[in-house]
């Protein structure tokens, strides 16, 4: 596989392979000396056209722990702010000898364009494109679930996952639905009708507008809360929900809803969180919460992705 652009690029064996390699990478990070020589002499460029804390620093840490040289590119402090196109930026990076380009862009499909337009010969990793996809987030979420819900090996066959919130604007939700289904999990999306995308009925998952019923009757193994992405909501199209208070009442995870969950259920969030809106402080900081763990797991998963793209072999996927 030359690129990782979508969770759909991975079949079951390829996805499990990434998770297995991530487990091996995580083991190396428990040692006193964490750095590996695997990608010495390779150059990884973090090309971020949107703000990011967790994803950008996670990819930077992953590449550096594999001994790659890292170039961090921010659109705000570059010629992009002067009108330079994605093509010209990519050609500049190609001239610098980039072996991999990790790209986050506000336009859906930008990483695919970068990978297939002939502007770069390096591997392209989608670190989030618009409201489309975020495959490495889905991989780290699946990795986190596997560590808690299985023996830490194999797939997620039979696991029940409820994803709650702003699905309409969430690239995380899309990638998770695709990957979790590939790994054998059953996924239910819960959101108000205004925050579900057109065509969601064709996604490989169930949908519901009733969070209490989904938690009480679905007996989920994992509940993933999604951030309400107010910055992507066009006010000219009207309100997506009556008020923040009403949204929290209907779709927020707090003390009462935590009590509906089976004892083993984990609580997840891809971050950043709106505490007090989609998730209460009590839920976010509870013993069930894996939110901080997810951030740490992201480094191991992204180490695995970079290793398999640049030094290993990942079967299937985008050629």
UniProtKB/Swiss-Prot annotation:
InterPro entries, alphabetically? Answer: Asp/Orn_carbamoyltranf_P-bd, Asp/Orn_carbamoylTrfase, Asp/Orn_carbamoylTrfase_sf, Asp_carbamoyltransf, Asp_carbamoyltransf_Asp/Orn-bd
The alphabetical list of record keywords is: Pyrimidine biosynthesis, Transferase
Where along the chain is carbamoyl phosphate bound?
54-55, 104, 134, 137, 271-272
| Catalysis performed (reactions) | carbamoyl phosphate + L-aspartate = N-carbamoyl-L-aspartate + phosphate + H(+)
Task: Detail which positions bind L-aspartate.
Answer: 82, 171, 227
GO cellular component term, pick one: cytosol
Under which name does UniProt file this protein?
Answer: Aspartate carbamoyltransferase catalytic subunit
